[in-house]
């Protein structure tokens, strides 16, 4: 008798990584998944470590936990004296906790210190097919490598430290395909802002998104990280890009990446991490890359975004009363009038940095627009590299000199002006061209007005004193 062969259903990239990490699925409960890498920083970890101490527990796998100081650190000085009292307590507490529990720490004096989502990938801590968590909402950044990466809360941070596992419900799957190639002046930041503008800030809620298509495949790893970084801004649990030769070339030789024979074996396994032909997604979104222009936000959430050659939207044109009301509120806060060309919106602050856009490719892009020019009168512009490695490389290439000669401030690594949690913040009424990921009310300081843009658009705005279409002479 012939026994029929068992057919294996085609799987998405997310399903493959998910299935490989299930530890147990207790009846009536959420599955328990294994965590390969745990990244911690000074803001969301103190209570977690305290919980371990109270319970008398040790770390389940200290060698899989990596710590850095980034959110509250000063970008003006590496001295503890430059920190606010609360920030100093947090960084000193992290240092003590890492010492007590045997966790590798990249403190403010370490040459590789930086934003957790910048230094993790550049050190090779981030690897394809792994599950990565961090007490930070932009952990999705690491999904650019084909990892399943997402943010967790402080109680979950403690649970991972103690068990190296998490209870998680399986998410739905969404494919976002960007077909064709972008035109000159359009970057990864513009791609992801266009996506969010299309599906809204809650369009990805409940999903893990896989970004694909020719435009995504053409991106560098830096660009893919920018796209995945903002998956949370469309409401998604995580964002992923299938690993390919671009991924392998980026990772080879990095400190924590496999070496020798292990490298060859790892690459062979990573090459299987792609969505199978015939695998079904719960939702699919398609964009034509050629239709994407440089983007910038006009309102108070990342979904309120338009192309640079468009005017400020008019709420009166919106038929949905809830959306119309939100638009009216946003315009009132942001201080713009419907119908105003975005190229006529003046700015007085520029921030180039954050876990979205502070990598070497981002700084090179901004420097092209700053070279040989001067920051406009009345504009304060700062450039904050994402890590010590990025800073050193930029300085080796002379990018720091280009920025400084143009009138930009060249800073130390850190989260900086992305959030009003350190000494880099906006004053009420300031209008900022920012390469960060959130433009919520008060995000960069009480009463501040934030417009999300690419590094090239931010640098150009600093020079012109207002937003410009970088595809044209200015």
Swiss-Prot record:
- Annotated Gene Ontology MF terms? 3-isopropylmalate dehydratase activity; 4 iron, 4 sulfur cluster binding; metal ion binding
User: What chemistry does it catalyse, as a reaction equation?
Assistant: (2R,3S)-3-isopropylmalate = (2S)-2-isopropylmalate
Pathway membership, UniProt: Amino-acid biosynthesis; L-leucine biosynthesis; L-leucine from 3-methyl-2-oxobutanoate: step 2/4
Tell me which PANTHER family the record gives.
3-ISOPROPYLMALATE DEHYDRATASE (PTHR43822:SF9), HOMOACONITASE, MITOCHONDRIAL-RELATED (PTHR43822)
Span-the-membrane segments of this chain are none
Q: Which protein, by its recorded name, is this?
A: 3-isopropylmalate dehydratase large subunit
Any GO BP: L-leucine biosynthetic process
Q: What is the lineage of its organism?
A: Bacteria, Pseudomonadati, Pseudomonadota, Gammaproteobacteria, Alteromonadales
Q: What does this protein do?
A: Catalyzes the isomerization between 2-isopropylmalate and 3-isopropylmalate, via the formation of 2-isopropylmaleate.
The gene for this chain is: leuC
Alphabetically sorted, this entry's keywords are: 4Fe-4S, Amino-acid biosynthesis, Branched-chain amino acid biosynthesis, Iron, Iron-sulfur, Leucine biosynthesis, Lyase, Metal-binding
Assembly mode: Heterodimer of LeuC and LeuD.
Q: Which InterPro entries match?
A: 3-IsopropMal_deHydase_lsu (IPR004430), Acnase/IPM_dHydase_lsu_aba_1/3 (IPR015931), Acoase/IPM_deHydtase_lsu_aba (IPR001030), Aconitase_4Fe-4S_BS (IPR018136), Aconitase_4Fe-4S_dom (IPR036008), IPM_dehydratase_rel_enz (IPR050067), IPMI_cat (IPR033941)
The record lists [4Fe-4S] cluster as bound by: 355, 415, 418
Native organism: Shewanella oneidensis (strain ATCC 700550 / JCM 31522 / CIP 106686 / LMG 19005 / NCIMB 14063 / MR-1)
**Which family does the record claim for this protein?**
Belongs to the aconitase/IPM isomerase family. LeuC type 1 subfamily.
